[in-house]
């Protein structure tokens, strides 16, 4: 071991040249004799160096056993989990499990052997063995590194094919620093003071150079030269080819039969920026010159490709420097170098959304075999046009500046062609500024300067405001120039909206920001037109009715803006704003320049009338009511009773309303009121009136009902009006509903009173109380009650639901009340029935009041509205008589008649004590051949009964009753 160490130190030691025969090293003294033999003299008492002590990467035995146990348990558990549902057969799984057990056993066994081995060491000093093992490993690494270095040297020198003398010379240079040339008097020791040998004469050297020049001239003249290598020079035994601006290569040869070999190469574009591996180049060049049948042509092709590859790599390095430290740093430029394809893909303006069009390609052009940069022009008018740039090396940054500038100019030119911008007339063609005019007031505009940053491709405004900054951000988020134009037009529209909002808000208007429709009102009208923007501005005054707005429809195209003024109603339905009403009949169109503060203030005073008109019209539309606004010539055709009340009044609006649609087609309309009513709004008096007129004189006119708010106008009392004062604009529509309800009540009351008078044609009929929903009247003869009947008119907000007839408890017809409550009968039938049956019930009541004593009881029973039974009961004798009274239609006579007859059981009951009375009535009243004088001439005798008209029922009942009582 000691000898090996000493030899290595001698090999790499520093030699002392003080004595020619002795070399000194750090580990001993080497004596050198004439035969170059060496003998090592080792000092007698030299101690070996201490082994370095190792203290890191050591664990206690307990921790090592614990870790190994945990590892073994996890491995077994993981194996069990992963092999539960394995598709392998049982034998394969068993073998895998056995291998796992053996592996874990070996780990524990190694630990056991290590523990046993440590016990055999004296004093348990096993740390010395660990230190020794570490030293062996370090030494082994050094030796391995030397072997690897020698292997690399052998590999790199494999192509040199040097003869053995050259290898010996190389070994001499390696050991001594220079070759040992005995022929020139050089010694292996490097001693320069030795005896000098004879040198080669200079004439011989020059003669050899001349011979080589002649040989090269002859050799080159016999070889095929590529056109690029026709420029060459032969000097000092070598031929130098200059291919400008690529390379300069020197070749030489030994004789005419030997091939050319590499001497030196110089790249004319490199300027020593990159270290070149000339050794590898020499190997490749010599291989080409030796093997190729056309060596110079192959050499040029190889060097040309090598130059192109090297130049492309240098461009790649230059781009990296520009991206990192140049003006395009900060993520504005990126490139991808593909060494296999020799292509560099270049992308600029990465921060711009237009980066998909910002591309360039650097590669080798096939036709010229030179490196070019190919830039596809992003001009939509000239698709497929490209620009090529040469001489890239060292000029790539200037070329990028030119590309970005031209790209910015193209974008500016395309924007200028849209007609939305103006160029800078005061500067030359290199100006990068466009002027975009935006309004500052309705009648004036100001230019805004739009520019493009040629480094980043970002649009920006000069001296921007907050609004311009927000729109600059939008401009840089789009890649389409059409979108850029649309964004700038939206900028102009926003400025217009800002100006109008400012004007209206300063004059007391309120601009609603909450109201936002899904699409502008005029969107469908202009959606097929290009470069037309529409915007809605919803404006109102604080005291206006809710949901009603003065709407400004802005239509902008280029520098022109048209303002359409509308009145509409907008409501929120399930979170979505919808237009419920829009006045497009009175559309007012004006230019933006015509809107002034005076116009805005004037509209504030005059528009309230239109708002209320349209609010009423909208309410009428919701109710599906026909209407016409009376203005212009239509106002001159109003009826006299309407014109009289509106003559000389200002700020008055009149709306003609169809009565039938207003009252939803009531049957009483055709005979009661005129078909048209008029609604008048007086905005100065804050008064709303409804005018109407009866078609003819009716009974209703003679009655006074204060609750109906009716005021008659003319002397005949046919025209009338209803009046309400309003204090809030929101309540105007409520008054319209109130008028509708009162008018409906008026029509119903008129219809009901007419029907009552037509049905109760007697001097006893009298209306005693008249209210909008109630009519009380008397119609019975000798009635002592305040009212015999009360009619309740049941209505809802829009129509009359039903009429409820309530008979007085003292009314003898109260027995039919249950039939009147079933809602099956028409009011006309009820009134007619009450009238023609009133005498029957009055007669029965009179008979009951006179006859009902302790001995005789008379009771009226009602089977149906057309079948009655008058029962007599004698309490003394127990006799009973049932007189049936039926109301039947008479085919021979118009109208109905009463049929009176006794019940069938009364004829067969011969033991009935009152049977003689029945026979007497039959003989005197019912028999056909009875010649007695009739008390009621209109009576028709039927044998088993009798029939009489409705008006003669009272004397007939009295006659029959008198016979039955006397008997």
From Swiss-Prot:
InterPro entries, sorted: Med14_N, Mediator_Med14
GO BP, sorted A to Z: negative regulation of transcription by RNA polymerase II; positive regulation of transcription elongation by RNA polymerase II; positive regulation of transcription initiation by RNA polymerase II; regulation of transcription by RNA polymerase II; RNA polymerase II preinitiation complex assembly
Compartments, as annotated in UniProt: Nucleus
Pfam families for this protein: Med14
Cellular component per GO, a single term: mediator complex
Single GO MF descriptor: RNA polymerase II-specific DNA-binding transcription factor binding
UniProt KW keywords: Activator, Nucleus, Transcription, Transcription regulation
Subunit structure of this chain's protein: Component of the Mediator complex.
Function of the molecule: Component of the Mediator complex, a coactivator involved in the regulated transcription of nearly all RNA polymerase II-dependent genes. Mediator functions as a bridge to convey information from gene-specific regulatory proteins to the basal RNA polymerase II transcription machinery. Mediator is recruited to promoters by direct interactions with regulatory proteins and serves as a scaffold for the assembly of a functional preinitiation complex with RNA polymerase II and the general transcription factors.
Family note: Belongs to the Mediator complex subunit 14 family.
Protein name: Mediator of RNA polymerase II transcription subunit 14
Organism (species): Eremothecium gossypii (strain ATCC 10895 / CBS 109.51 / FGSC 9923 / NRRL Y-1056)
Lineage: Eukaryota, Fungi, Dikarya, Ascomycota, Saccharomycotina
